Regions:
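A short amphipathic helical element positioned immediately N-terminal to and/or at the very start
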Residues: 14-19, 61-69, 344-353
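Membrane-water interface segments at the C-terminal ends of transmembrane alpha-helices
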Residues: 23-58, 70-183, 209-232, 263-280, ...
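Juxtamembrane inter-helical linkers in multi-pass membrane proteins
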Residues: 191, 199, 286-302, 338-352, ...
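Glycine-rich helix-loop "coupling/hinge" segments at transmembrane-helix boundaries
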Residues: 231-255, 340-341, 502-529, 562-570
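Peri-membrane helix termini and adjoining interfacial loops of integral membrane proteins
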Residues: 7-11, 53-63, 136-149, 237-245, ...
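Transmembrane alpha-helical segments of polytopic membrane transport and secretion proteins
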Residues: 1-33, 280-316, 551-574
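Helix-loop-helix hairpin linking two adjacent transmembrane segments in secondary transporters
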Residues: 246-271
Length: 574
């Protein structure tokens, strides 16, 4: 009976919503165009993968999967990927929690330093840690050869090497998630437990940790998804420990088996979708937020000398390891030829800005085109989802956020299947790379915009509408200026992801348009580690310059407000 009433109520409302749309042609056109874009560049590529995998001679069939799974060299990568994902997610979450707890709950110095250290991996190429691992612990490594004279053999290729580099790469996601969780816990609850005679250790075990449990689960699922999707690190360090993302790539590129590669992509997609659904629709419903206004009490601090100095020492060691890895890349970029001639030189940078300039130029051009388009489109979708009522609104939101769950390898395969044949042939052009950049990380901008709009009183925009302005005018003149920080945070995040992309774009790059991350991968494969290091340093420098420029624009337009780039990354957990 209740369902029937809801259906009747919806049918009564729907015509009114549709009539409102027809009164605003620009709004109607905008909704149609957004849905067309989402279908073409998110839904269609995924559909093409499923179509190729489940269709044999025009008939539905599981034959491709039977064939793929009958080969041991395809089953092993699936098991390896799941094992690695579980291990990386647990270890990353432990380290992320230590940093987050130290910054929010422990009375230690250098909190800002530890916070910056924990977020630095976000702006670095995801496979930079693998490069550093080779420079440090490879056969010609700084530690293994120069210090230990090869007395100890470090097994950096395989499971343990990947575990270390992926943990150091992705623990920042866990840190940002758990930092927000711990900040949201009302300190009055912890103070009340202390007043009742509980020790600070007891408060941690009985109050803080249980309230943070959903956030911990969310962090584990997020890092698990990132580990499954990782492509660059396994390409460099996997050795004989093959994983699914690289196996799908090698199946297509090396064996020319498109059907087999598509089937492997679906096997990679399934656990990612499960993790996404658990994180979004189960964990996120378990509330850990206890602050509903400004806390009336100060947050307790762990100040016991043993606890304080133990956590401080642990954070210091972890920060030292992180800086050692990144510092080694900078040092390696100044070495003439790693492993043969360790004299210092700047010739690698000369090579980067001469022979490698085409890679830099193409990356900057494509990223600079994609970033503002992605930012504006994300804000439009957020505006439509939060402020407008129309049929299919929830579906639009779901599709726009779908790329959260889809690994880059799956997206790349989908794009070459969807846009390598009429009516839309884009392979080999700059357009396919730009479109992939736009829609690959669109979800972060949409989520950032939605979060910001939900904090703004809609009466401000309603006043504009009451004065005769249509939706497009209200969006340009009222909404967009109000969400400037979210807009620029989305721009910053998108630009960083464009500059460091590898897993999806490796399928669509061509001789005419290439990317700096492809150049780094090629240099590593050719054992030219010094040039790879120089390219990596240049990426970070350009990213930092871009972030400074975006912050400068915010200062000019937004009255000195700071962009929250880390917030865009952290919103993936919500």
């Amino acid at each position: 009976m209740l369902k029937r009433k809801r259906i009747v109520a919806y049918l009564k409302r729907a015509p009114s919503d549709i009539r409102k749309l027809f009164r605003e042609p620009l709004l109607l056109i905008g909704i149609i165009l957004v849905n067309v874009f989402l279908f073409l560049f998110i839904v269609l590529p995924l559909f093409k993968i499923f179509q190729l995998s489940f269709e044999v001679n025009g008939q539905f069939s599981l034959g491709v999967f039977v064939d793929v799974l009958s080969k041991r060299y395809n089953v092993q990568p699936l098991i390896h990927s799941l094992n690695l994902g579980v291990a990386v997610s647990i270890l990353s979450t432990v380290i992320g929690f230590i940093f987050a707890y130290a910054v929010t709950r422990v009375d230690i110095p250098w909190k800002r330093f530890f916070s910056v250290t924990a977020t630095f991996p976000i702006i670095a190429p995801p496979f930079m840690m693998s490069l550093s691992a080779i420079l440090l612990f490879g056969k010609q490594g700084f530690v293994s050869k120069m210090i230990l004279q090869n007395l100890i053999e470090f097994k950096i290729y395989g499971f343990y090497g990947l575990l270390v580099v992926e943990t150091l790469t992705y623990f920042s996601t866990a840190y940002l998630t758990l930092y927000g969780v711990l900040q949201a816990i009302d300190p009055a609850l912890e103070d009340a437990a202390l007043d009742l005679g509980a020790s600070k250790g007891k408060v941690f075990r009985s109050i803080t940790l249980p309230l943070a449990t959903p956030g911990i689960a969310s962090a584990i699922l997020l890092v698990f998804s990132q580990s499954l999707a990782d492509f660059g690190n396994p390409m460099i360090l996997a050795g004989n420990y093959t994983i699914l993302a690289t196996q799908a790539y090698l199946t297509i590129v090396g064996m020319y088996d498109m059907k087999g590669g598509a089937a492997l992509a679906i096997l990679l997609l399934i656990p990612s979708l499960i993790a996404f659904c658990l994180q979004k629709y189960w964990v996120s419903r378990k509330s850990y937020v206890t602050v509903t206004g400004k806390p009336s009490t100060t947050r307790i601090k762990m100040d016991h000398p043993v606890t304080k100095f133990s956590i401080f020492g642990l954070c210091l060691v972890l920060a030292g390891i992180i800086f050692l890895f990144y510092g080694m890349v900078f040092f390696g970029s100044l070495v003439k030829l790693w492993g043969a001639n360790h004299s210092l030189t700047i010739n690698n940078y000369k090579h980067v800005f001469t022979v490698g300039w085409e890679f830099i130029k193409d990356t900057l051009i494509l990223s600079s085109i994609a970033t503002p388009i992605a930012g504006i489109l994300a804000m439009i979708i957020a505006f439509l989802v939060v402020r407008k009522n129309f049929p299919g609104k929830r579906l639009m939101e779901l599709v726009s956020l779908l790329t959260f769950a889809v690994p880059g390898t799956v997206v790349g395969i989908g794009y070459i299947l969807a846009f390598n044949q009429p009516p839309l042939v884009l392979t080999g052009t700059a357009a396919i790379i730009i479109l992939l950049f736009i829609f690959r990380d669109l979800a972060v901008g949409v989520q950032t915009g939605i979060a910001e709009l939900q904090q703004i009183d809609p009466s401000i925009e309603e006043a504009s509408t009451d004065l005769g302005a249509d939706s497009s005018h209200t969006f340009r003149k009222i909404t967009l200026p109000l969400i400037t920080p979210a807009f620029y945070s989305g721009l910053a995040f998108t630009f960083v992801k464009c500059m460091t992309a590898i897993s999806a774009v490796i399928f669509v790059v061509s001789g005419k348009w290439n990317l700096i991350t492809i150049a780094i991968l090629g240099s590593v494969e050719n054992s030219d580690l010094s040039q790879a290091a120089a390219f990596s340093v240049v990426i970070i420098v350009f990213i930092l310059l871009a972030l400074w420029l975006i912050q400068f624009l915010v200062n000019q337009i937004g009255g000195g407000r700071k962009i929250k780039f880390e917030k865009a990354e952290a919103l993936q957990s919500r």
